[in-house]
Amino acid sequence: MKQLIQNFKTGELYVDELPAPSLSNAMVLVENEFSLISAGTEKGTVKVAQSSLIGKAKQRPDLVAQVLQNIKKEGLMATLEKVRTKLDSLKALGYSTAGVVKASMDTNGKFKVGERVACAGQDYASHAEVVAVPQNLVVKIPDNVSFEEASFTTLGAIALQGVRQANPKLGETVCVIGLGLLGQITCQLLAANGCRVFGIDVSNSMVELAKKVSKTESISRNDAGLKTAVETFTRGYGFDKIIITAAAPTNDPIELSAEIARKKGEIIIVGAVKMDLPREPYFFKKELELKMSCSYGPGRYDKVYEELGNDYPFAYVRWTEQRNMEAFLDLVALGRLNLKELITHTFDIDDAVKAYDLVLGKVQEPFVGILLRYPPNDNKHSKQINTIAKPTNGKIKTSFIGAGSFAQSYLIPNLKGLNVTLDTVITNNGINAKNVAGKFGFAAASTDANQVYQDKNAQVVFVASRHDSHAMYVEKAIQSGKHVFVEKPLCLNETELASIQTLMQNNTQSLVMVGFNRRFAPVAVELNNLFSKITEPKVVNIRVNAGFIPLDHWTQQAEIGGGRIVGEICHFIDLMQFFTNSTPIKVYADCISSNSIQAKNDDNIAIVIRFANGSIGNLTYVANGDKSLPKERIEVFGGNICGVINDFKDGAIYKNNKVTSLKSSGKGHSQEVAAFIKSIEQGTASPISFESIHATTLTTFKILDAIRTGLPQTIN
């Protein structure tokens, strides 16, 4: 399919052939007919990408702070690799489209194939022939509304949410500052609400358009008669409400709004404007009220609402972002809004770059609503494309399912120089698949994992997708006779584990490896070489200052990420098995009991594990510590010897009253990948036995049981 994309590193805009997106739960697959360019927002996005590295840093100081913090934690080189991965990426543009449903997995069965729908959402409702959009960001189009009009729906919902925040009453005076596309729609919504509307803009053409389309009394910001016009319009009182829909780097819109508002008036900010609020002479003396309007409305930026498809109760949240979208289309259907006169340009998707020449000012021509049109194309639903990248020449044909930042930083680069051919990279998002394929030299980019399993010549599958898909992809690999490396965790529950175990009992062909990398770190191997000679039981103490992860992060969702016990603590259980050379037989666990709604209690946990050979492991895992404390400390005791690893940056051996320092070179990511490929080349067993992988995974589930019951759990 064709899609407009931007190279975030170079800023280049172009239309490319990409694999069509795959469909997953709570999503709707839509074939676009039209999409709307949001000139203000998208111009800003494009200009950021086209700026220099210093320019990007100035516009996102929060990310600069993250980089500096990451350097302290992971070192300069590892951080540089992460930054390169982020910069060397392709970005989707657009967030307001209209088209036809081609398939749906929405949880309510609301959307049927062939229905006309409007779609919203950055990275979802993109300028592409086909899009996959979360169900709560899709609404049906009324019969008498055209695709062209419906493509305005996202912008309409943004404008409508700004009006709802203003809560205007019949007959109130409302000023709209900024008469671009968003401001023009806002003026029409206010007029439909029975308000007396006044518009201000720096552009004379936008002022005239507002007068023509919505019959809004409007004036240029630079007009010397502005204050007189405001006094006349408001009968000397000032405006009841002011809605700022402008995008401006200066403080002028906020200062002007304070000046022309009435005493106890309200200012609602919808656009991206500077907000240095001057206390004097107006905000304080007029007791002005300032409100923010958040995008399309309630539900925006809530992953549970947008990504999982969980709606808010109608009686308690009347106007969600989806219901705002519906309300906007209802007004269009009733003839209350005139959108056709706001459409100034329409381009076919092949000419999308020309549209952005208008937006960026490369072509000096007035514009308001710019639409992209999607003509018929027989290839728009293809889920795989071949790349022009020069493929690697190894013997082992290798594919990746999932290629996020972790895979791009720690897995794919470590295959370089090994006896592999990078065949196909599969992601849900065609942009990411194409980007990774080109960057690392994969022969093909795809959004359909089944193609890999059906390929008889494919030998190895790396699974680096979201945790809830791991078990399914591992099972398919075993069933199709392919070797599989899956990032932790192996699976999310005992049912999935039992299913994989059953397949492994009859498996004589596939190696299964889980990304428990720490046991492969050189400093860990050196310690283990010493302690493996000691036959008596050992004590292993591990302290992990893991750091806070918000409750709405996908890894914290039990059904998707499994939580940190299943998704992260498995690392350290495997490491304990490595040092004790034994399997867990019993586990004791308890977590904090906090009343904070921000804290996830089992992110802060103390665990004791008894091993079959009499060894003991103690794990303290916390999310409520301070970032300045190094993340991990490991201590191993046995045979009158002590070994220590400090955050995998250095270590020490304490023996015979002497201390021997150990140097560290990473957490074992490159070594684990090399060991896995070597075992395939030589036809030997997996570097980590399935029995050990099974024991580690089962122990994480028993830890959850121990917390729930307050009782120690036996591990069989």
Kindly label every feature range from the protein language model:
Residues L4, V176, N193, G236, ...:
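C-terminal capping/lid region of NAD(P)-dependent oxidoreductase domains
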Residues P21-L36, T45-Q122, E681:
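Glycine-rich beta-strand-centered segment in the early N-terminal region that forms part
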Residues E148-D223:
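Mid-domain Rossmann-like dinucleotide-binding core that forms the NAD(H)/NADP(H) cofactor-binding site
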Residues D357, G361-Q384, G567, I573-D650, ...:
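Contiguous beta-strand/loop segments that form the cofactor/metal-binding neighborhood of enzyme cores
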Residues K380-F440:
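N-terminal Rossmann-like dinucleotide-binding module
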